[in-house]
Amino acid sequence: MNVGKTNWTEEQKEAIDTRNCNLLVAAAAGSGKTAVLVERIVKIITNEENPVDIDRLLVVTFTNAAASEMRERIGDAIVNKLCENPNSRVIQKQLALIGKSKITTIHSFCLDVIKNNFHMLDLDPDFRVGDETEIILLKNETLEELFEDKYLQAEYTSKGINKNNNSIEFLKLVESYCGNKNDQVLFNMVMNLYNFSMSNPEPYKWLKKAAERFNVDDDFEFGDSLWAEVLMKNIQIQLLGMKGQLIESINIINSCASIESYRENLEVELSMLEKLIVASNNYEKLYEELKNVQFKTLKRCPKDADKEKQKLVRDLRDGVKKSLSKISEDILSQNSEEIKEEFKVLYPLMKTLSELVIEFDIRYKDKKKKRGIIDFNDFEHMCLSILTKSDESGNIVPSETALKIREKYEEILIDEYQDSNMVQEVILSTISRKDTENPNLFMVGDVKQSIYRFRQANPGIFLEKYNSYKENKDEKNRKVLLYKNFRSRKEVLDSVNFVFKQIMSVNIGELDYDDNEKLNLGANYEEIEENLISHSAELNIIEKSEDNTEIKENNEDEESVDNIMLEARLIGRRIIELKENFKVLDKNTNVYRKAEFKDIVILLRSTKGWANVFSDELKNMGIPVFADANSGYFDAPEVKTMLSLLQVIDNPRQDIPMAAVLKSPVGGFSVEDLIDIKVIEGDTFYDKLKVAADIGDDEFSVRIRTFLNRLYRWRKESLYTPIDEFIWYLYTDTGYYGYVGAVSGGIQRQANLKMLFQRAKIYSETSYKGLFNFINFINKLKLTSGDMGSAKILGENENVVRIMSIHKSKGLEFPIVFVGGLGKNFNLMDMNNPVLFHNYLGFGPEYVDYKKRISHKTLAKEAIKNRIRIETLSEEMRILYVAFTRAKEKLIMVGSVSDIKRSVFKWAVNLRSNQNKISEDYVLKSKSFLDWIASAVIRHKDAENLRDIMDTSKENIDNLVCDPSSWRVNVLSRNDVLSFNQLLLEEEKNINEKLTQFYKRLKEIRSSNYESVYIEEIKSRLEFKYRYEKAAELPSLLSVTELKRNINEDNDEYATKIFTPSLVKKPLFLEEVKKMSPSERGTAVHSVMQHLDFSSISCDMSIKNIRHQIDDMVFRRILTEKQAESVNINRILKFFQSPIGSRVIKAEKVYREFPFQIRVKSTEIYNDLPKIYDDENIIVQGIVDLFFKENDEIVLLDYKNDYINDENLNETVKKYTYQINYYKRALEIVTGLKVKEKYLYLFYTGDTIKIE
């Protein structure tokens, strides 16, 4: 199935070998574009006749992971070339230069340009990149200060202290779009507009131009505006859809003479529609033509007329009337004069909005400058300012710096070109020779996979070149189409093509899915007869409601957990069937094998609210699952508890957080306790607690006093401790970290707490400090960035089913792909914002009369709303394409509807059409992926059971789309899905019944005179012992310490001696106060040795120097005071004064607390295991105290704090030799270097013992 390195298609060869032109490679999904890009680069740099050094190529990718993979693949290819031609100096040179290669992300390239030319900017050379946390806080702070200043200026103006019309307009802006509650709407508007404008090469110019569009003069005609042009195009799509509906109505009349009386009305209305379509090229003409729209009453049909056909025609006609009425309402609501007056009112508001964003950016830049930081927007815009200048006409042209960089690169290669934005396009254009006689721009991508418009990616950049570049070989601007897919089976490709050739068009999808765009088979899958499940595409539709009488059409916006569970259960059942009965081609062995869990992925448009439900349901069905979700973190109980504790420490007079803490394991109070506290006198829980603490000396009062004392200590500690260290201090002081580790799901819970600590650590490195600011940051993070996914504790190579968003799946492939949640409505909520933004059309505001408190949408907003809807649905279509094209062997779609009959009638609108494509009007009005998929599939011969749901199913339908794809369409009720679990229970019950009958029969046999041979045979089968039963007792993982501990023990009883799981450490808050044990003192010494700054240590240093470092460790919460006091500093000093200590200080590289894992045969660890266990491996893990390099060899050092005397010295050395030898073995495996010496250092005696 894999494409061989030399077995390129003709199109791939052209993409690899074409030179001396600007080349656009349109690469379909699975067409091997990365392999082509790598081969092109390798051929350029290893050309013996005309080689180009790799550091003279600029390769731009859009993620760091992609850049790393590209560099690695190119490096491997160079090595392969060198093996073929080991004496080539050209190839040798390229291998040496690979480290200097410019294979980078666009942001990394921009950062390099900034660093090399910072003198051209007003930028501190010691600038740093601001952390995301810091940037969010700084933006919010800047905008809040700006708003405060505007309010203050407005107040001064109202009092006549100064005259500032701008501040008055600011208040009007607030009044118009914020209502009476707060100014959050305007705050979000400014922030969103700022982020949006930054994708423009000249944001200030764009902002001012967008506002000036409303500065109309007396000659202004709306019909000549860009808004009218967009409105007309959208209306034309709708009118063509209406025309199709009327033609369908007339066709029904043609087949049914009993409703012939409807024909005259419909033909008149069809003629009226055709006039409107002609007029839709001109706003004024359409305006006049709409005035003539009228629908006369339909003539009566005979009593014996076909009622079904009669209703169908009337419904189609009513749909046309409704749509046309909406268009008339929008267009005829205002004439040009009224629009002009409205724009004059809006102009000062839009101008103020633009100026507000510009002023915000100026202030934000100033704050960043003072802190010496830049953000990701600065990467591109600062780079742009270095590489460009304006000519006399104000046009952007390359600067002298850009021209110098242009000379450096022989070719510029851009991967994932469909995801570029305008700023990136200008940057790369300035340093390329694309407009010269020697063009050198290579661009590869697939516009059908452009799914990052929310990051301001602009697929129009790719499309402009795609539509203008030619395929001719002698063209300066040339394109090559890679249309073969080497990933998927024919069944998958056919089903993808069948859907998209019907729904994707230039108007919706921004590309016509024709023969040039369809996926063509390139993979070579051998047929496999023993598969019990076909490779046909599957569409599973669940009717999620039992009672269809009260269903609202739009209720798919918010799914209940119960409804999501239905899809999860259906998918779970299908996974179980596939695992048992489906075979996949193993990519490593190229041999068919049974499907495993890791072969399966479940893709969702959004994981929020879905992934956790899916995960829980699949786990309940015994299916291991890994959900790569971006939500659920802040809802985790352990995270909520710690955040509540932080809030209480910051301000204890907050009842809800206080109640949460008291009821948690940290507080240890019951619900009954809280009720008792609640009735005590006081305004807040905190006040009540203080009263209760003084009531008496009973157990309840003592517990409260203990809690308040701890709270006091925590509050005091928070004042001078960095937030990350303070959080970890709370984990240990409360014992909460240990507690959550001991309960169900402990590993995940502890990982979530670690994630909170890491977030605090990042925060503490910013210019913001303090507990209050951190809590404020977390609250804003919830509001602005939304939730985060829980900490990841499962690796990506585990044998589990994966759940992920479609966006995260881009670039990946899986043998079996489920696409779920297809019935969920598209998210078009952003179109309801009071002011819309569009790169081409500018602003689309609502008109608001804040004095009368009335508002209505403007035609400018309606135009932008229509345009955004088309662009959003085009993006959604591409997202669906990405989801479908992840599948290699099996594609399964799952969606839910409320009323299956109503949905089928909606999908069947295009069923009688003789057009291959579904009408654009229908595609535009669709509300979900399922609407698109089902309306296409219902036209396929295999969807008979879907058509059977319609009452007209007996009618012969001649317009099914002829297509080679094969489909399996299933329609299930809610009860069908819920019965899956019942079936599983019944199967289990049947097995139990059979076992009961078997044992009953066995008793009869034993009591009868049957031949003893049969009894012995049955007995032997029942008492059968599995040959490898000891494998179940072997551990998967052992520590070196456990090996050492058991080396001298009899290891026959594996489970009891070694593999008894250790209990989770008892939480600190449950432990009694006691002296430190020898092992705890040893841990303290190890911590000191791990964190000592060796670079500041010399052989003649004093105890004072070491004491200072240990005190610093206490301050940083690395050690407790108790641990620090237990450390014998003289012994530490003695170590560094020893010969081995001196070598450590002088070593070129020292590694401390180095963790490792190695695979060891079980028979090597347990000598008495039979040879049949040779293939059973055990992971041995450990931590090496210290090793250092000397002349590319390793010196290993293990140190111990044990009590040693002359009597037990030899025994101690012998005890640890086994352990040290494992360390040696591990280091040689992991580092590839030889361990030349091994030492054991004994702190108690100061002896250094060489281990032979």
Curated annotation (Swiss-Prot):
Cell cycle: is it a keyword of this entry?
A: no
Q: What EC number(s) is this enzyme filed under?
A: 3.1.-.-, 5.6.2.4
Give residues annotated as binding ATP.
Answer: 27-34
Where does the record place the UvrD-like helicase ATP-binding domain? 6-489
Which GO annotations describe the biological process of this protein?
A: double-strand break repair via homologous recombination
Q: Which domain of life is it from?
A: Bacteria
Provide the reaction this enzyme catalyses.
Couples ATP hydrolysis with the unwinding of duplex DNA by translocating in the 3'-5' direction; ATP + H2O = ADP + phosphate + H(+)
Q: Which residues form the UvrD-like helicase C-terminal domain?
A: 523-811
| Required cofactor names | Mg(2+)
GO MF terms listed in the record are: 3'-5' DNA helicase activity; 3'-5' exonuclease activity; ATP binding; ATP hydrolysis activity; double-stranded DNA binding
Q: What are the GO cellular component annotations?
A: cytosol; DNA helicase complex
Task: Read off the InterPro entries from this record.
Answer: AddA, DNA_helicase_UvrD-like_C, DNA_helicase_UvrD/REP, P-loop_NTPase, PDDEXK-like_dom_sf, Restrct_endonuc-II-like, UvrD-like_ATP-bd
Keyword list (alphabetical) reads: ATP-binding, DNA damage, DNA repair, DNA-binding, Exonuclease, Helicase, Hydrolase, Isomerase, Nuclease, Nucleotide-binding
Family in the record:
Belongs to the helicase family. AddA subfamily.
The job of this chain, per UniProt, is described as: The heterodimer acts as both an ATP-dependent DNA helicase and an ATP-dependent, dual-direction single-stranded exonuclease. Recognizes the chi site generating a DNA molecule suitable for the initiation of homologous recombination. The AddA nuclease domain is required for chi fragment generation; this subunit has the helicase and 3' -> 5' nuclease activities.
Its subunit composition reads: Heterodimer of AddA and AddB/RexB.
What protein name is recorded for this chain? ATP-dependent helicase/nuclease subunit A
Organism of origin: Clostridium acetobutylicum (strain ATCC 824 / DSM 792 / JCM 1419 / IAM 19013 / LMG 5710 / NBRC 13948 / NRRL B-527 / VKM B-1787 / 2291 / W)
